[in-house]
Amino acid sequence: MGTNEKNMTAGSPGKLIITFAIPLMLGNIFQQFYTMADTMIVGQVVGVEALAAVGAGDWLVWLVLGIMTGITQGFSILVSQYYGAGEKENLKCAVAKSYIMTALLSVIVLAVSEGAVYHVLLFLQTPDNVIDLTMLYLRLIFAGVPIIAAYNIFAAILRALGNSRSPLIAMTVAAVINVGLDLLFVAVFGWGVAGAAIATVIAQGFSALYCLLVLRKIRDIRLEKEDFYRQPSMSLRLLKLGTPLAIQNVIISVGGLTVQYVINGFGFLFVAGFTATNKLYGILEMAAVFYGYAITTYVGQNLGAKKYQRIRKGVRSGTYMAVLTSVFISGMMVLIGRNILSLFVSGEPEQIRQVLDIAYKYLFIMAVFLWILYLLHVYRSAIQGLGNTLIPLASGIAEFVMRVSVALLLPKWIGEEGIYYAEICAWSSAAVLLIISYMILIRKYKDAKTSES
């Protein structure tokens, strides 16, 4: 079991970014595979209502997990900067404090989410025929928040050190375990949506354990007891980086919940169609997320090393690769998307036709405008790597305002199809803000003295 840290302050920027991102993308293919397997098994074995029940909880899951993802991603920014600067004592302290803060926050998030879930589902007008199943699914997922938080912080620290191979292995192991447990719990034991939720949490536990074992082998972050107590102010620095990203994800999630509120009013078949497409959304967004992780690590390490010209070169290379990748994925979804969507549904032929019509129309629109989402991830990640998490927070607010406005108003003017454009408009508003902000921020490093030769 290797440690595979990677110093990104020397070498070809484009090569470093792509070799860092590819293992993460491969890992996410497995992750999306088991997410899709969840949906396929539930949809095919249990039926359309169960599929709608899982889908009705999607944005609530995204909200809770987004808090932990944002916090841990923010923590990893400081870790990558200390690693790039070669400040080993500060690096160890940042890792130790990240563990403590993540554990405390996961307990708080667990308590709040379990207590609020039923009331939120009622507020969202979740269809009566699926609300009980949705609540069961969510309560089980939320019970696993500390496990999921552990995986997030362990994987975030590995990425900050330039190690993208170990998260790939962890996600691959989780995918295999999850699919196997899905088949056992849902298809054999007949546990329905509860079985799917339990399988997901157990699989995440295995991935967290693997990442922890890798971290324990890395000499630079072998923690001593005093690392957890030194520099109390370090916790505040971590929170200043992590909190805006968590709030950003909360704001984006609330916008998504507003969309879910509107969709719920269109009936459970519409919910099922949206659910099928949202499961493919992970594939659409997959490469963007991991180009983003690569760029955050790359920018953070080079900022710590004061190699500012490399930052500009790396972001430029990342932009080209991201746009080309988005065009390829869009073409694939347009060509074979409907066939993939058909794997998620079973039931009466007329129901299947309606669900697929809704799902493919939404998928087609997202595929056409996917390049905007990829630009959003590249520039948001670059800004985060520079240590600025307030501008990404502002972009989250822009997403929220646009997503909610379009979701509430456009369906009134052009009918149900108006809801399809909420995501596109949200991406566009955030991407414009982020690109302009990056151009302004990077200028201050233009004439700065660097450590580059």
Segments (PLM) and residue ranges:
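Short alpha-helical transmembrane segments in multi-pass integral membrane proteins
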Residues: 1-21, 79-144, 188-243, 299-368, ...
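N-terminal transmembrane alpha-helices
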Residues: 8-45, 59-74, 78, 103-110, ...
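Transmembrane helical elements of multi-pass membrane transporters/channels
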Residues: 19-38, 140, 151, 174, ...
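Transmembrane alpha-helix boundary and packing residues in multipass membrane permease domains
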Residues: 24, 28, 40, 77, ...
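Helix-terminus/linker motif at the lipid-water interface of multi-pass membrane proteins
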Residues: 29, 33-52, 121-128, 184-191, ...
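Small-residue-rich hydrophobic transmembrane alpha-helices
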Residues: 51-111, 148-167, 273-337, 373-395
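Hydrophobic transmembrane alpha-helices of multi-pass small-molecule transporters
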Residues: 63, 178-182, 208-212, 283-286, ...
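Short runs within selected transmembrane alpha-helices of multi-pass transporters and secretion channels
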Residues: 72, 140-159, 167-175, 196-209, ...
